[in-house]
Curated annotation (Swiss-Prot):
HAMAP family: Kup (MF_01522). The chain crosses the membrane at residues 41-61, 82-102, 130-150, 163-183, 194-214, 235-255, 276-296, 309-329, 366-386, 395-415, 426-446, 450-470. InterPro entries: K+_transporter, K_trans_C, K_trans_N, Kup. Keywords: Cell inner membrane, Cell membrane, Ion transport, Membrane, Potassium, Potassium transport, Symport, Transmembrane, Transmembrane helix, Transport. Pfam families: K_trans, K_trans_C. GO terms for cellular component: plasma membrane. It is a multi-pass membrane protein. One of its GO terms (molecular function) is potassium ion transmembrane transporter activity. This is Probable potassium transport system protein Kup. The gene is kup. Belongs to the HAK/KUP transporter (TC 2.A.72) family. It catalyses: K(+)(in) + H(+)(in) = K(+)(out) + H(+)(out). Transport of potassium into the cell. Likely operates as a K(+):H(+) symporter. It is found in: Cell inner membrane.
Length: 651
């Protein structure tokens, strides 16, 4: 296998300059193409990665000022303290923690909390359940964030209508609901055709942020003294109680920072970093400092400073641009939710889900109907229940701070176990990050009664579902394994006393390659026949995102009648069994789909008082198993080649 070549195995020819072309010219052309490609990726990152954090100026500074003025007084020192906190939070958390460290902790180029969990589980063999639990919590918090982001983003943009036309205030929530329902309704059509405009629109958005902020900085240029951390520290120390509440609101300026890591696989580290350092970070800072300067010179403008500082002729266009930006931010989060859900299914944290591909060219563009429906319903319910973006702000921070806290914990394991850093080197950095994360998490967790319960409730329900699925599948595996016959024994018996042999190939899917598949045993028991060729097939998900076709299949022969095939897929890949079995032709097995039957076991589960799991968890697991997508569709097996054999199992 290692000696075989594929279409990508001739890099030396591709790297050589064209014959007759001076080397300097060839390299100049390569450099120009590289620069154009980099610009495209940077523009793409603006549209996907930075939509969430890019729309934070609409509400983050406003909420932080409201918290700082909770004692009824908003002094100049409060305004400078808040903008200084935002500047240093963005610098320490996004620029240093994520850009310098977290983005380097990729799993074969992929990012995201489940990728990080899989990477750490592969490196830390001793405590797999602990790491799995941490990863499940992180994934649940991500889904909580995915519910809140579209609601607060679009709602905050629509609130700009209150400035444009106060008479439209009663219609803010209905218009928001219409936009969100439309957004979720068109997901099944795919986003490939419209995604091409996301980057340019977000580039225009960031330029508008920077320009409007820069213009108003001249209202009071002394606002720039807030770059000095003295003002942030002074604000924290003068009124610790009010400052602690304000810190929770300041964190809203960083919501979306986790997207830098989650979308790492789509764009790569360099485009994400360059987009942040060249465009996003400078434009965000200009806007926040511009809002601060505007309020310093117009003290009465703290209600909706983002829209109030716009000139009258630009107000309506800015509301429309903000709406487009928040829809794009919502789309990025929805797409991210699909990706995380697929990873969770592949890692066996969730039951199989129907996954539809919306693009023939881009395999990453998927649509998951069940996730879309549940996410859409939850978002609309939040909008109708909370009605104002300021009410949702309390719910927003908990999910994101929790996700960041989980990321920091896993990052420490990456540093010490994968990067092989000494503890004395890694610990001070991680402790610094943990202090910041815990401070933000603590400042947000006290808002449970104000709306934080929604975020915690969503995450808790998802943790319960995922952990029940993990425990239930393990229990079912152990229970069925005790009752099953070792495969070696069946092979020996069939060799000594073979039943009637029928032509063709039978493929038996099983999760336990050491035991005889249930479908095989029932076939022998009821039909008393054995196929000419019998394949015991196991599908394995690797702890890395992508597995090459060269490493896809492993074949071992028991005897002339039985062989074992193991197919390995990455957790970002959609299993296609017929296509993968075609690779086995190179390994000596002449696979022919037209003479092959696939035998699948369909278990009917029943709750049992003696299962070892609580009865309620038994029933929840059974419900999840019943809602799982059909294995035939999930593994993309032609329905005409499938034989399903049903069995009943008492948990």
């Amino acid at each position: 296998m290692s000696g075989e070549l594929n279409g990508n195995d001739t890099p030396t020819q591709a790297a050589m300059p064209a014959v007759g072309v001076p080397e300097s010219v060839a390299f100049a052309e390569d450099a120009e193409q590289h620069n154009e490609s980099m610009k495209t990726l940077v523009l793409g990152a603006l549209g996907v990665v930075y939509g969430d954090i890019g729309t934070s100026p609409i509400y983050a500074f406003r909420e932080a000022l409201h918290a700082a003025a909770s004692d009824g007084i908003l002094a100049r020192s409060d305004i400078l303290g808040v903008v200084s906190l935002i500047f240093w939070a963005l610098t320490l958390v996004v620029t240093i923690k994520y850009v310098l460290f977290v983005l380097r902790a990729d799993n074969n180029g992929e990012g995201g909390i489940l990728s990080l969990m899989a990477l750490v589980r592969g490196a830390l063999k001793g405590r797999p359940d602990l790491i799995l639990g941490v990863g499940i919590c992180g994934a649940a918090l991500f889904f909580g964030d995915a519910v809140i982001t579209p609601a607060i983003s679009v709602l905050s943009a629509m609130e700009g209508l209150e400035i444009v036309a106060p008479d439209l205030t009663p219609f803010v929530v209905p218009i928001t609901v219409v936009i969100l329902v439309t957004l979720f309704s068109v997901q099944k059509l795919g986003t490939g055709k419209v995604a091409i405009v996301f980057g340019p629109i977000m580039a225009l958005w960031f330029l508008a942020l920077g320009a409007s902020g820069l213009w108003h900085i001249f209202d009071d240029p002394t606002v720039m003294v807030a770059l000095n951390p003295y003002y942030a520290v002074r604000f924290l120390m003068i009124s610790p109680g009010i400052a602690f509440i304000t810190v929770g609101a300041v964190f809203l300026a960083m919501t979306g920072a986790e997207a830098l890591y989650a979308d790492l696989g789509h764009f790569g580290r360099k485009p994400i970093v360059r987009a942040w350092l060249w465009i996003v970070f400078p434009c965000l800072l200009l806007n926040y400092f511009g809002q601060a300067a505007f309020i310093l010179s117009h003290g009465e403008a703290a209600a909706l400073p983002f829209f109030q500082m716009m000139p009258s002729f630009a107000l309506l266009p800015m509301v429309l641009l903000a709406t487009a930006a928040t829809v794009i931010a919502s789309q990025a989060v929805i797409t991210g939710a699909y990706s995380v859900a697929r990873q969770a299914v592949q890692l066996n944290i969730l039951p199989r889900l129907e996954i539809q591909h919306t693009s023939e060219k881009l395999h990453g563009q998927i649509y998951i109907p069940r996730v879309n429906l549940l996410l859409g319903l939850a978002v609309v319910i939040l909008v109708l229940g909370f009605e104002k973006s300021s009410n949702l702000a309390a719910a927003y921070g908990i999910a994101v701070t929790g996700n960041m806290l989980v990321t920091t914990v896993l990052l420490y394991i990456v540093m010490t176990r994968i990067w092989n850093w000494r503890v004395s080197r890694a610990l001070p950095i991680i402790v610094g990050f943990l202090i910041i994360d815990i401070m933000f998490f603590g400042a947000n967790i006290i808002k449970v009664h104000e709306g934080g319960w929604a975020s915690i409730g969503i995450a808790a329900i998802l943790v319960l579902i995922m952990w029940t699925w993990v425990r239930g599948t393990r229990h079912l595996f152990n229970k069925t394994r005790k009752a099953e016959v070792p495969l070696d024994l069946i092979v020996q018996q069939m060799t000594k006393r073979p039943p009637t042999i029928v032509p063709g190939t039978a493929v038996f899917l099983t999760g336990d390659p050491k035991s005889a598949p249930t479908a095989l045993m029932h076939s022998l028991k009821h039909y008393k026949v054995l196929h000419e060729n019998n394949v015991i097939l196991t599908v394995v998900t690797a702890s890395k995102p992508w597995v090459s076709s060269a490493d896809r299949a492993r074949v071992s022969q028991y005897n002339e009648r039985f062989m074992q095939v193991t197919l390995t897929f990455g957790y970002m890949q959609q299993p296609n069994i017929p296509r993968a079995l075609g690779i086995c032709r190179k390994l000596g097995w002449k696979f022919d789909i037209m003479t092959t039957s696939f035998f699948l076991s369909r278990r009917s589960l029943k709750a049992s008082a003696h299962s070892g799991l609580p009865l309620w968890q038994d029933k929840l697991f059974i419900l999840l198993a019943r809602t799982a997508s059909d294995a035939t569709e999930y593994f993309q097996i032609p329905t005409g080649r499938v034989v399903e054999i049903g069995t009943q199992v008492n948990l």
